Amino acid sequence: MRMLAKADIRRRLQPLAPLPTGLTPRGALRAPVRSVLFDVYGTLFISASGDIDAARNRMSGRSGLEILLRKHHIARSATEVLQDLYAAVEAAHAATKKSGVQHPEVDIVRIWQAVTGLDSRSRAKDFAVEFEIIANPVYPMPHLPVVLKYLVEKNVAMGIISNAQFYTPLLFDWFFDAEPEGLGFRPDLLFFSYRFGRAKPSPVLFESAARVLNQTGV
């Protein structure tokens, strides 16, 4: 099976609109602002699912997963696969917590290989990407390119701290034909949870960011 092409992925991406928060902006930043660290889901990109429980409800009746399973020749029902997916994630979390990690992050590719029985990591990555598009549709927040361009022009150091998997950084390429670094994010200020095996609210990601900012005089 060939790897997913960006054009194939883009055909499945649909526009989304953000929901109003119902909150009134207040407070003011203290100048000068020298760095901005963003989250991804719900900040840079609109996320339709919101959280894992919402994703479970969203997927439970979706025919998209059944189609995906047939495409990858997996002779199981969507319900069975979803049950095994969430059980595998919870088991991985529990095992890691026993080693003293309070807020673990899973390797979703390894999880999918175990759940689906796919024989290679590349096939499991393709499956993970397609599942994510079905389970958690995303779309850039309004005016995102304008905001990033403004911060770049003002020499504001931009970074990301996000609960994420390997496909999260790919969002920038899918929508903007650029990696995060190409849009002005500093490579040393990209803190994706899957790279650390730790998820927010673990202080590990924030402490790593603070260390880099201190070392570079920001």
Describe these PLM feature segments.
Residues 64, 143, 205:
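Charged catalytic carboxylate motif
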Residues 63-129:
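A metal-dependent, Asp-based hydrolase signature
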Residues 48-60, 98-102, 169-177:
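Short, flexible/disordered intra-domain loops and linkers
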Residues 66-70, 145-149, 153, 211:
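Surface-exposed alpha-helical segments enriched in charged/polar residues
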Residues 139, 159-161, 165-218:
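Substrate-recognition "cap/lid" segment bordering the active-site pocket of phosphatases
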Residues 30-31, 121-123, 151-153, 181-187, ...:
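Short helix-terminating capping/connector loops at secondary-structure junctions
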Residues 101-110, 118-121, 132-160, 168:
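Short, acidic loop-to-helix structural element flanking the phosphoryl-transfer center
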Residues 2-9, 14-15, 20-83:
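Active-site neighborhood of HAD-like aspartate-dependent phosphohydrolases
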